A protein has these predicted regions:
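Catalytic cores of eukaryotic secretory-pathway lumenal/extracellular enzymes that build
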Residues: 29-31, 43-46, 96, 169-176, ...
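Extended ligand-binding groove/face enriched in aromatic
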Residues: 99-161, 186-227
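Short S/T/G/P-enriched beta-strand
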Residues: 13, 90-93, 97-101
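Short capping/connector residues at structural and topological boundaries
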Residues: 13-15, 154, 176, 222
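Extracellular structured ligand-interaction cores
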Residues: 23, 55, 66-68, 79, ...
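Well-ordered alpha-helical scaffold segments within catalytic/enzyme domains
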Residues: 73, 166-187, 203-210
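Ligand-binding face of N-terminal immunoglobulin V-set domains in extracellular IgSF glycoproteins
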Residues: 2-87
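Acidic/aromatic-lined carbohydrate-recognition and catalytic surfaces
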Residues: 50, 78-94, 179-199, 209, ...
Length: 227
């Protein structure tokens, strides 16, 4: 049971659909006035194989007025309150961009910029080639590979995903520079560069360290525990 909506919200001109696992009549309620602004009937969308449940759509796309709303089914079930508005994705964009800062490796995240998610500088040791490490080569060459972003929920840092992420961010800025002028509240904020470029630079400086003398690029920098 339950009524599932987009908790980020809906643009006024976008399609607006909630989903349920039961057929119903429904109303869209203005949460400020508690008045119904739309009445509708669910439509059967068939079986969702991944969920193993029958799914029904509650379409209220005709409602375009900005405001706070919730969906109320005829059986009394109601959704969380959500927003219809022009700027529903703005905070989501800022949150997504700030995620790159929280992935930073090799520097301390302080409460000024990270709030409760602080930690000391991590993974600051020099790197060695995996073969030298596994073979316990005496006095192997050491490399400064500090910096960059942690990748994929672990402590590895990989050139291929890094290049894709930085490339997409730079291309997004090239196409829509006006959309990336808001401060992300990172240590570099206020240095006359948009923070999307500041964050890309943090990763690019690490990527430069990963380039070998022959022009090639090492694939990844990771951590191995000897047990």
């Amino acid at each position: 049971m339950g009524i599932f909506i987009d908790q980020t919200g809906y643009l006024p001109v976008s399609r607006k659909v909630a989903t349920t696992t039961f057929p119903c009549n429904f109303q869209l309620i203005d949460s400020t006035t508690q008045h119904a602004v739309y009445d509708g009937v669910s439509t059967d969308s068939g079986m969702d194989e991944s969920a193993g449940e029958q799914v029904y759509q509650l379409d209220f796309s005709k409602v375009n007025a900005p405001g706070h709303y919730y969906v109320l089914a005829g059986n009394g079930e109601r959704s969380h309150t959500f927003v219809i508005g022009e700027h529903v994705y703005k905070q989501l964009q800022l949150d997504l961009m700030k995620c790159f800062y929280f992935q930073r490796c090799g520097c301390a995240l302080t409460s000024e910029y990270a709030g409760e998610y602080t930690h000391a500088a991590c993974h600051t040791e020099d790197a060695v080639f995996l073969e030298d490490y596994m073979n316990q080569t005496p006095d192997p060459p050491h490399f400064d590979m500090t910096g960059g972003w942690h990748d994929a929920g672990d402590f590895g840092r990989y050139i291929s995903p890094a290049a894709v992420a930085v490339g997409h961010l730079l291309y997004a800025y090239e196409l829509f520079p006006e959309s990336f002028q808001t401060s992300l509240h990172i240590p570099e904020s206020g240095n006359l560069l948009p923070d999307i470029l500041n964050e890309c630079l943090y990763e690019l400086k690490w990527m430069l360290k990963m380039q070998a003398d022959n022009g090639g690029v090492y694939h990844k920098h990771h951590y191995t525990l000897r047990i």
